[in-house]
């Protein structure tokens, strides 16, 4: 896992798609915030990476251990996959979701309704990433709701849930007697 870069303010972990249309303005907003930020963005344009990789932003070419990284992060920025969003919330971290597809958009709506983060819909032109990041950093209600989620599901064991699902599927596949 890479070391966090120097910077001011909360630590951001960004898990991003290289094809995200708002990637350049998002990275510009993150750079302007000077928050220490770790970014995983497979396939990012080398020129874009070079422009922002520096004092407060560090890019990783390799996938990072999210379970080890999240306890050190303060805010998560992602596109809203179910797994990434669930991991962030189970770690008690507020999230900025930037969906690129319908499923992620629906997850974003639920997250915003619950109050554990903010989202910017894909059709928003001139998205104000800076204001969203500032709100997540300065308004404690988002972190409080994320911690509420983490506390509520503290007993969640992924392996136990998977075993239960497999057992139910196997039972459903058994011929009726």
Please state what every model-predicted region is.
Residues 1-75:
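Donor-nucleotide binding loops and adjacent catalytic segments primarily
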Residues 63-110:
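A donor-sugar binding/catalytic signature common to diverse glycosyltransferases
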Residues 128-177:
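C-terminal amphipathic helix plus adjacent low-complexity
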């Amino acid at each position: 896992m890479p070391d966090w870069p120097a910077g001011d303010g909360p630590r951001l972990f960004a898990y991003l798609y290289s094809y995200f249309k708002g990637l350049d303005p998002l990275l510009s907003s993150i750079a302007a915030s000077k928050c220490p930020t770790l970014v995983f963005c497979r396939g990012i344009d080398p020129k874009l990476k070079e422009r922002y990789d520096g004092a407060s932003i560090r890019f990783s070419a390799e996938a990072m251990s999210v379970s080890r990284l999240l306890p050190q992060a303060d805010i998560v920025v992602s596109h809203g996959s179910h797994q990434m969003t669930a991991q962030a919330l189970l770690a008690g971290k507020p999230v900025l979701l930037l969906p690129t597809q319908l499923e992620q958009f629906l997850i974003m709506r639920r997250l915003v309704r619950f109050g554990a983060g903010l989202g910017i819909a894909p059709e928003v032109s001139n998205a104000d990433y800076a204001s969203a990041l500032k709100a997540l950093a300065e308004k404690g209600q988002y972190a409080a709701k994320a911690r509420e989620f983490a506390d509520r599901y503290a007993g969640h064991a992924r392996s136990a849930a998977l075993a239960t699902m497999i057992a139910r599927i196997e039972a459903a596949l058994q011929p009726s007697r």
